[in-house]
Structures are given as structure tokens and as C-alpha cells.
Amino acid sequence: MGAIAEQLPSTTLHWVNSDVAVHRVVVGPWENNVFVVRCLRTGDAVLIDAANEHELLLELCQRLGVRRVLETHGHPDHIGAVPAMREAGFEVGVTSADAPKLAQVGYDAFIDDAEVIEVGRLRLRSILNPGHTPGSVSFHVEGTPLLFTGDTLFPGGPGNTSFADADFDTIITSIDDRLFPFPATTIVLPGHGVDTTIGAERPHLAEWVARGW
């Protein structure tokens, strides 16, 4: 994988404290964020959204001690590297509601709402966030401000709900009831683009409802 290793940025580190490091790469034509959450006490890690460019992701996994893959939802731009990850031996988890979207690429385990996923000494708690897809899910790293929201919440509003099985009212309720109760300092790490915070987005909910997207 020498040539692939050269394609990795000089640093993939995105956020760090004494317990956890978050690494980020941007892949594919839709510029998807792929995150690796790593426990600094044990070296264990999990990858969020095996989107694309599987060779690069496999190199990243080898470097960082990734043990499994978590999918925030089943849209094609978020699952393009899933077959290669599974072939390499990584378990891929997705919610049961979005599992049919992975019928062609496969999956290994269901992620339930409020499930605690242990990554070394870290605990990631799943938060079911329907709206963008029926089974979209976010992940909060307990004891940290980190909240991975997939395509549910972005800087400036909710994810796209123009798909056949998406629903704007549902995503608004999902964000308001399940994400906005987090503290204002919570860092939102979305599936595309830059980070934001709950405090930056929460005051604009009524604007989003009024505009309808």
C-alpha cells in the first residue's frame, strides 16, 4: 500500500484530548467525511462511514487500529467502500431501518437506538435520527463534546429530505428532540463539510421550518 500511503494527508488528526483522537479524511466525488474515533488509552478505534476510496481507508485503518465500521445511513455515497472493508474482515454495522439500502454491499450487525458501542475505554452512544433516511443514526462519544451526525445536521440546517423515503418534518423533530438537547458547546461533525456546534445551529430551527428545507 505504499502508493496509497503517500496519498494520505500529512496529518489526518482532526480533534484530540487526553482520551480520544478523531481522524478525518475526505473521500469520493461527494467529498464525504470519513472519521476514525480512536481510544488513546488502548489504541482501539472505529471508523464512521466507509464512503469511498477503500484502499486509502484500509491504510488508515491499519495505521489507527480500527476494529469495526459504523454507518450513519445507507445512501450510496456513504457505503461505497463497505464491500472492501468487509472483505478485509471489518464488521459493518447499520440500523435495521437502513439495512435494505446495503442489500448489494452487505452488512454484519444492526445498530440499535441508544446502543452503547465500546471502543477501548470509550463509549459511543447511538442516537436514531430518522428523516434524511428512515434509519439515519448519530453517534455521541460519551464524556466528550463529540457528536457525529452523518447527513442529519449540518452548518446551516438539516440534511436533504428530497428523497422518496425522506421527510422534512421528521428530520426537524429528530434534530429538535434528539440533538438540540445537547449542550451548546457540543461539536457537530457532519458527513460532509465543516464542523459546527449545537449552540451555533439551535437558534435557527424556526428559520429552517419556515423555509421548508
Descriptions of predicted regions:
Residues 2-6, 15, 24-36, 40-42, ...:
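Active-site-proximal loop/helix segment associated with metal-binding centers of metalloenzymes
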Residues 11-64, 138-150:
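Conserved beta-strand hairpin/beta-sheet module of binuclear metal-dependent hydrolase folds
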Residues 30, 53-55, 74-80, 99-102, ...:
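Active-site environment of divalent metal-dependent phosphoester hydrolases
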Residues 31, 45, 52-125, 204-211:
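Active-site HxH/HxHxD metal-binding segment of metal-dependent hydrolases
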Residues 37, 72, 129:
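Conserved S/T- and glycine-rich ATP-binding loop of Class I adenylate-forming
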Residues 39, 97, 107, 114-122, ...:
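Conserved catalytic scaffold of divalent metal-dependent phosphoesterases
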Residues 48, 93-96, 148-149, 190:
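Hydrophobic residues in well-ordered beta-strands that form the structural core
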Residues 128, 133-213:
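Metallo-beta-lactamase
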